[in-house]
């Protein structure tokens, strides 16, 4: 096709679709005895895009992975936490199966399966949620519960969570309604006290009350493109009953609440059961026995707990698990740094003793897997600073002494006569 303004005879040309003349449009494209203007081309593109949006959800729903497939995908990125992965796989599968069947099956209304993740910091709560969203190819957003307040107070409104989700999918409401929202630090909005107070708890119980309807399912009115609300404005209507909410928190001290409940009734005085220290359950074993009544005592209101029917507990990561995290997942930390070094033409080797030292440091800091990156970054900082300016470095070797800060990484050069250790 060619761009023409006049035919060979010099006659005025018109768009065959809208009838506008060549003087009313910017471009006129000629085909075999027909013409189309740039405006009609744009309109056709818009129609095709809308058609694709409508077809895409049906295509995604037909390819819903089974719980086994979801679990297998999580295994590629998350080490350990086997029970939590199984619980999540079933809950997520059931949620999207419910959406695919229009919330009903043979006339039976299917309930919503929001999820509560309980586990220490750095145990993989956020990573599990992110990995699920990536597998299902749905919009994902994170919110920090500590920044939320009731409407009308200084802080983030709970509806801002839905606004963030819309931003992730370019304000496509249909796509947002199939998304996943992860609310972190949910334990920090627990009720501050069991006793009623004359001062309003706007960041604790107040936020729980504000989140109730959002999590259960309501039609949230969100201003388009992140604008502020005003009366004359048209709002985007988002049905949150189709959005999967995953709430996570460390719940420090919950193990003591569970322990008190479990041990109550074991007798008092001479009838009490005496337990040795070795007989006492670990924190992970206690958290696995969590009941709604324990969460109520911790400070969550019963209505809020009722909106999170699926509870998964995560264990504190052991030293062996941290070593696995360093080298086994598809996006393992050591693989990431090896890829960075390969861009500079150098091979990066972590000796086993170095991985042990990194895991020991992370255990001592009690930061779980989250602390691994900062330890590796500190050990490699000087090398990453110098390497781009150095020639012929073929290999960088990291051993235990480098992690402990006692020596610098061993640099191996391409030319035998130039081999040297930077720590010498």
Swiss-Prot record:
Organism: Klebsiella pneumoniae (strain 342)
Binding-site positions, Zn(2+): 15, 18, 37, 40
ClpX-type ZB domain boundaries: 2-56
Record's keyword terms, sorted: ATP-binding, Chaperone, Metal-binding, Nucleotide-binding, Zinc
Native organism taxonomy: Bacteria, Pseudomonadati, Pseudomonadota, Gammaproteobacteria, Enterobacterales
Residues the entry annotates as binding ATP: 120-127
Protein name from the UniProt record: ATP-dependent Clp protease ATP-binding subunit ClpX
Function of the protein: ATP-dependent specificity component of the Clp protease. It directs the protease to specific substrates. Can perform chaperone functions in the absence of ClpP.
GO biological process per UniProt: cell division; proteolysis involved in protein catabolic process
